[in-house]
Amino acid sequence: MMTAKAVDKIPVTLSGFVHQLSDNIYPVEDLAATSVTIFPNAELGSPFDQMNGVAGDGMINIDMTGEKRSLDLPYPSSFAPVSAPRNQTFTYMGKFSIDPQYPGASCYPEGIINIVSAGILQGVTSPASTTASSNVTSASPNPLATGPLGVCTMSQTQPDLDHLYSPPPPPPYSGCAGDLYQDPSAFLSAATTSTSSSLAYPPPPSYPSPKPATDPGLFPMIPDYPGFFPSQCQRDLHGTAGPDRKPFPCPLDSLRVPPPLTPLSTIRNFTLGGPSAGTTGPGASGGSEGPRLPGSSAAAAAAAYNPHHLPLRPILRPRKYPNRPSKTPVHERPYPCPAEGCDRRFSRSDELTRHIRIHTGHKPFQCRICMRNFSRSDHLTTHIRTHTGEKPFACDYCGRKFARSDERKRHTKIHLRQKERKSSAPSSSVPAASTASCTGGAQPGGPLCSSNSSTIGGGSLGPCSSRTRTP
């Protein structure tokens, strides 16, 4: 059966649906009772409001048969039977649904209307029997044979709907789940195989095995994989990451471990904006980390990697003032540089260790963010501030902040020069302040300006330029 969920208005002309019948079947005097207007005013209210008074389920069911019976229609107060011309066009409404008597052809188990058939007789026939019934299943099972007279039936056969509501085909791999892999013992156990075969999802198609299942070298790297991370190495890797870390104890030649890195707590504090450990003020960050980190981490790195055994190369960038004498006496600098051609001496061993890294190119401090290496820990500390945006050094004059103390020192010199200019400004601004205009009432030959009495450097000023005439 043809179905539709939406309620539509369909204009129908009576003369187009019926066959021509003989004029002598029924008396002519009974024709006036056959013309009825179902909806005298179709524009009043919504379609559902008009249909609520016709039937309990909001639908009109008309079954026109060939026998002559009296007209029996329950009309509401708004729908009164009125005589209408023979070929008058009227509007009817109805709901259509799939007949559930065809199994598999309907997607709705409970249909709204099983069969909807409208038998419309031409005006020359006798008054037809129009019955409104809520149960339409008692109608004729064959809608095409409703009567010997002309019948307009909307129906659709079963084969026309099979392609619309046909069930999906079964999975193509439903019965061959156990034949996908010839030898599943190489990869899965028997229990796993039986469990996977009962899954609802179809398994992937089978492919030929590249190697026999008994080949012990199928995955040669698996047995040796735990050797890369022994338990002792894992404890060292997940231990406290600080400047006093010892050299990597695992004898792995293929695994190269980088030198001591910046503590994650330091980067986390910088990233979250919290104060780093050991800092109490804007200038305490650079002052505390500078002397503390080089003495401890530099000594540990020197002992771990033995930078003295590395070849010493000459410094690519020599000192700006190589012959400048040091302020510290020689006897107070007992640590000379062992590099050939370098006359530098230091009073502390950690200073010598940092200096030797210049010759060896050793950079044991690595940034965890960009993996850049540095030879000094304080250089790494200032470099991390470029990632975190930390600027702990503020200017005392304008409040501008800097990431390095030398940048603040260089900026402070600008304020000092401006202060010197302001102090020398009053002496240079006296001539400009002493130059005054003449009184407006003075004439060209009159007395001198009032500013003539002012003196600069003991000398008296001449008359104003406006009164001075050149010969």
Curated annotation (Swiss-Prot):
Ubiquitinated by WWP2 leading to proteasomal degradation. Acetylated at Lys-246. May be deacetylated by HDAC6, HDAC10 or SIRT1. GO terms for biological process: facial nerve structural organization; positive regulation of DNA-templated transcription; positive regulation of myelination; positive regulation of Schwann cell differentiation; positive regulation of transcription by RNA polymerase II; protein export from nucleus; protein sumoylation; regulation of transcription by RNA polymerase II. Pathway: Protein modification; protein sumoylation. Residues 410-420 have a biased composition (Basic residues). The keyword Transcription applies. Residues 280-289 have a biased composition (Gly residues). Its EC number is 2.3.2.-. Sequence-specific DNA-binding transcription factor. Plays a role in hindbrain segmentation by regulating the expression of a subset of homeobox containing genes and in Schwann cell myelination by regulating the expression of genes involved in the formation and maintenance of myelin. Binds to two EGR2-consensus sites EGR2A (5'-CTGTAGGAG-3') and EGR2B (5'-ATGTAGGTG-3') in the HOXB3 enhancer and promotes HOXB3 transcriptional activation. Binds to specific DNA sites located in the promoter region of HOXA4, HOXB2 and ERBB2. E3 SUMO-protein ligase helping SUMO1 conjugation to its coregulators NAB1 and NAB2, whose sumoylation down-regulates EGR2 transcriptional activity. This is E3 SUMO-protein ligase EGR2. The gene is EGR2.
